[in-house]
Amino acid sequence: MPPVGGKKAKKGILERLNAGEIVIGDGGFVFALEKRGYVKAGPWTPEAAVEHPEAVRQLHREFLRAGSNVMQTFTFYASEDKLENRGNYVLEKISGQEVNEAACDIARQVADEGDALVAGGVSQTPSYLSCKSETEVKKVFLQQLEVFMKKNVDFLIAEYFEHVEEAVWAVETLIASGKPVAATMCIGPEGDLHGVPPGECAVRLVKAGASIIGVNCHFDPTISLKTVKLMKEGLEAARLKAHLMSQPLAYHTPDCNKQGFIDLPEFPFGLEPRVATRWDIQKYAREAYNLGVRYIGGCCGFEPYHIRAIAEELAPERGFLPPASEKHGSWGSGLDMHTKPWVRARARKEYWENLRIASGRPYNPSMSKPDGWGVTKGTAELMQQKEATTEQQLKELFEKQKFKSQ
């Protein structure tokens, strides 16, 4: 069984990683809570921490039970500029400080139910996409950091950055806290959206002060680990050291382009056929470990059973299974209790490792054609606004989409 939390002081994130321990992250909150009816797809903002704290708390608990060592505050897209972007108007009823404080309180409550740490997280901003200055963007991060310091989170994460320039600004802001900082980018092997290679991104993040670097979101485990490998090689070439972190999608994305799954036509409401199985995630966990990654978790699409798969695969190295494994036989071994003999015959590793999974959709293609438009910071269509998107703006986008698909 895992170590139990309590009055005894917990080891910090760097203490764990420096000792060679495996740290298991959590999964994807905005996608999971959108499916449950607590987050709106589009803005993907986390006001549910105030409006539906019980839903956020329960998801944290499920990840903790599945084996997570880190409770990330539900503060993805909780910056002031995002909470009032494109007609969202969250700030008219709830302040950004309330959202961030509530998220910290919930994460701490659940973390203290086990041996988990609390990580306060910031992510990319509408201000950066709209070409605001470094000072203005850092001010947005600082507003969240002030809450994280007040609530005394254990460490900080700058996650989900498409541009290393903004990620560096985030790290430089967070590092002033004196707390350990992790930084992950949502990039693939081609690098960030300004063309900066993964290895150089890693070097810049470490030089800015990050102790843990890697990737999260946008790409599947296979592609994400290719990117982490390039980051690792970049650090080795520069003779820099940092711990490696991976929190990919739980969706298969072999057909995506530089911007990842956001460019796939199935994003966000048709991704279910792409969901990774628990066995896919066990394979990912082993490959990540063999690469030298010691902070292993997930992002969008990752449910608690995916996190449990990581914990189960790495149980020999960690020395224990998570509580959720009490209801899960290794490699389907619990199926030996099934009433049907052909299902009992599936109670073995070889069956699940070698199964070629059908989608049940006979007339559907196995791959899609990404429809990303190649836009990035500074492009007119990426300039953000407080006001809701107008009918005319939508009409222009619909017409452009028709033209692009021809």
UniProtKB/Swiss-Prot annotation:
One GO molecular-function entry: betaine-homocysteine S-methyltransferase activity
Keyword set, alphabetical order: Cytoplasm, Metal-binding, Methyltransferase, Nucleus, Phosphoprotein, Transferase, Zinc
EC assignment: 2.1.1.5
Residue ranges constituting the Hcy-binding domain according to the UniProt record: 11-314
Cofactor(s) recorded in Swiss-Prot or TrEMBL: Zn(2+)
Stated consequence of mutating residue 299 to A/S: Impairs zinc ion binding. Loss of catalytic activity
Quaternary organization: Homotetramer.
Name this protein carries in UniProt: Betaine--homocysteine S-methyltransferase 1
Organism, scientific name: Homo sapiens (Human)
Gene responsible for this protein: BHMT
